[in-house]
């Protein structure tokens, strides 16, 4: 708001105060005289648009006054957009960056790898089918399908791991036999035969020691050259069936024969009916 507007407001307020004082002094003499309400500039709501709008009175006052060097800029759409852009630029400057720039270049450096040669290498790797198998050449199959190659490779890997397992087992067995002072047996026997042989096959299998009485009986038997012993027939099961079981078996045979005869009769009836229909 310019200086002329402020002077006019001060003049209006001073006039209102003088009228109020006069009305207070003359209220005792005249009761019918009306009083003037003082003007209160604070109570009114100021319109913000009036700051930028220039009235003809204010223009005349600004021309007449020598102190009023500042003139308000009219509100336009262009000014609003420029103000918004300036605010946006200030906000960007104040905004902190999450990652501080290091100054290093991004991406793959140029001249390190030729994309044409990389594509050629990829095609060669895709077309190459690994090492060839000699038994396929006998079958006149130079380029085997991918499924066959996969099965052959799996079989080779399986055989390799089985052989490693066998060597590991042989190594552990040799160490255990050396600790038991039985290392001489490995020179005379094959490993595959020793693999399925127990270490205590030569000795007694049962840990219970036999009594001396049984040894004496064995010596007497050797002298007499008779190793046959008589035993009771209590453990022998008789092969004769009881009476009840035989009856049940006969009844089952009869029922099976009756069922077979019924089936034959029904089949004969069905065939006769079909012949009549035809």
UniProtKB/Swiss-Prot annotation:
Bias type Polar residues, positions: 22-33
Chief site of localization: nucleus
Function in brief: Component of the transcription factor SL1/TIF-IB complex, which is involved in the assembly of the PIC (preinitiation complex) during RNA polymerase I-dependent transcription. The rate of PIC formation probably is primarily dependent on the rate of association of SL1/TIF-IB with the rDNA promoter. SL1/TIF-IB is involved in stabilization of nucleolar transcription factor 1/UBTF on rDNA. Formation of SL1/TIF-IB excludes the association of TBP with TFIID subunits.
Record Pfam families: TAF1D
Organism of this sequence: Homo sapiens (Human)
Any single GO BP term: regulation of DNA-templated transcription
Keywords: DNA-binding, Nucleus, Phosphoprotein, Transcription, Transcription regulation
Protein name: TATA box-binding protein-associated factor RNA polymerase I subunit D
Origin superkingdom: Eukaryota
Biased amino acid composition, Basic residues: 88-99
InterPro entries, per database record: TAF1D (IPR027976)
Subunit comment: Component of the transcription factor SL1/TIF-IB complex, composed of TBP and at least TAF1A, TAF1B, TAF1C and TAF1D. Interacts with UBTF.
Residue segments, region Disordered: 20-71, 88-116
Gene Ontology terms: cellular component: centriolar satellite; cytosol; mitotic spindle; nucleolus; nucleoplasm; RNA polymerase transcription factor SL1 complex
Presence of the UniProt keyword Transferase in the record: no
Entry keyword annotation includes Cell cycle: no
Residues bearing the modification Phosphoserine: 23, 138, 234
GO function terms (MF aspect): DNA binding; identical protein binding
Subcellular location(s) of the protein: Nucleus
């Amino acid at each position: 708001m310019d200086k002329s507007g402020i002077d006019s407001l001060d003049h209006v307020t001073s006039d209102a105060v003088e009228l109020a004082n006069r009305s207070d002094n003359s209220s005792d003499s005249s009761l019918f005289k009306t009083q003037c309400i003082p003007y209160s500039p604070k109570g009114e709501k100021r319109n913000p648009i009036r700051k930028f709008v220039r009235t003809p009175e204010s223009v005349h006052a600004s021309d007449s006054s020598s102190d009023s060097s500042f003139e308000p800029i009219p509100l336009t759409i262009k000014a609003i957009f420029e103000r918004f852009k300036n605010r946006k630029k200030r906000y960007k400057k104040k905004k902190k960056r999450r990652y501080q720039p290091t100054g290093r270049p991004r991406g793959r450096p140029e001249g390190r790898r030729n994309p044409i040669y990389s594509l050629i290498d990829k095609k060669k790797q895709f077309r190459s089918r690994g090492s060839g198998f000699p038994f396929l050449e006998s079958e006149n199959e130079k380029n085997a399908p991918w499924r066959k190659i996969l099965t052959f490779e799996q079989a080779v890997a399986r055989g390799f791991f089985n052989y490693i397992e066998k060597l590991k087992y042989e190594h552990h067995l040799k160490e255990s036999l050396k600790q038991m002072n039985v290392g001489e047996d490995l020179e005379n026997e094959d490993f595959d035969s020793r693999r399925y042989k127990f270490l205590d096959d030569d000795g007694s299998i049962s840990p219970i020691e036999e009594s001396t009485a049984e040894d004496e009986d064995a010596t007497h038997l050797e002298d007499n050259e008779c190793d046959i012993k008589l035993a009771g027939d209590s453990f022998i099961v008789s092969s004769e069936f009881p009476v009840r079981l035989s009856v049940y078996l006969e009844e089952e045979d009869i029922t099976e024969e009756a069922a077979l005869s019924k089936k034959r009769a029904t089949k004969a009836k069905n065939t006769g009916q079909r012949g009549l229909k035809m």
